[in-house]
Structures are given as structure tokens and as C-alpha cells.
């Protein structure tokens, strides 16, 4: 367990049933069975030396707890917009930094379709408010924060968005997201938007004119670009215009 973790649970400063729902969360050790690879003493020592010396970063995580009764409570849980960060689980892993992709397509606070500008700001704001009430997971804004997390036995959390649909046709929303802490954003999330074509589409039209401007802006302010759910031609265009 990482040394800086002191037992904090998400939103524990709020009163259950009044300020936050009392939905029962599933314990991490119940949701997923343990997957153990047996190591001999030499291998164990090697792993420990790597963990001690190197920085471990995950570029894609959703480090949250889900309801014990998933089918019954998931809709209410998502509507609330307060997904519970799994602090204890993070303390038991080797990650020094994680890219938190937040609620993504299940960010259905006000709309069943997801990906609404107001909703993603609520999601991000709630997560950052919770982070501000503890000191184990730190909001990562620069590379130095990752090194600090490593040295202090903490985890650096980088907020990200897997799709740019919420910015609609507003270029300055990229700057706003950066100001709130977003350091990585996808061009599309499988479906096309104002920037380009997603993987689901039968035809890939590449980056739109607005998409080219968005790529330029992201490069200017230092926001990394995710092409995981982006069409092939659109991805090639992102590379060309970066």
C-alpha cells in the first residue's frame, strides 16, 4: 500500500442520504477476482527494484467504484454525477500517475445521450472538489507533479476526455478545459462530431476545417491528442496538422 494513503473515502465530507446518495458501493476485491502470477525470490526482488526506481503511468483509467447492485442503481448513480474515486484500490497498485477518463459516455447527468458540455463540467468539478478534500491523490497539472507523487508515495491524477463532442463548435472551450485541468482529449469517441470522423462511421471524411483549428489550438496550449476512437483518415490528418 502506498505510504501516503490514510484511509480517505470519496465524498466522505458529505452526509449520505442528504448531500449524496446512500447507494451501496461494491468493494473492489469482490468485483474482480485476484489474478496472481507466482514469482520466485529473485523475480520478486527484480519487480521491487523496478517499482522503486521507475515511474509507472497508466494512460487510460476509470478509477472509480460502481454500485453493489449495478443494474438497480447505475442509472441513479450516473445521474448524480458523483462517481466515487477508488482511493484504496489506487493505494494498492504500482501506478504513480493515471489519466482519468472520467464518466465518458455514461455522463448522463442531464441527458441520456451523454457528452453534454454542462454535464462534463459537473463531472470534472465534482471530481476535483473531492480531490481537494484529501491529500493522497493529487491533481496533476505538470510533469513535476508526477515526480512529486512518486517521491511522496502518492498518485498523480490527470483528468482527460476521450471525445471532443462537448466543445461543439466553440474553439475556446479547449482553453477552458485546459484551465480546469484537462491535459488529454480525444478528437472523437467512435461517432463523428464537429472535428472529424469516428471509428463507427462507414466513411471517414477526415478532419473538418474546425477539427484542424482544434488540433492547432490543442498543440498551442499543450493538450495531448487521443486518437483511440478516431477514424483512420482523421487520425492521419491529426498527425499531419500537429
Enumerate the predicted regions with their spans.
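Histidine/acidic residue-rich metal-binding segments in metalloenzymes
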Residues: 46, 169-183, 200-242
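N-terminal hydrophobic targeting/anchoring segments and the immediately downstream early-domain regions
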Residues: 1-187, 193-203
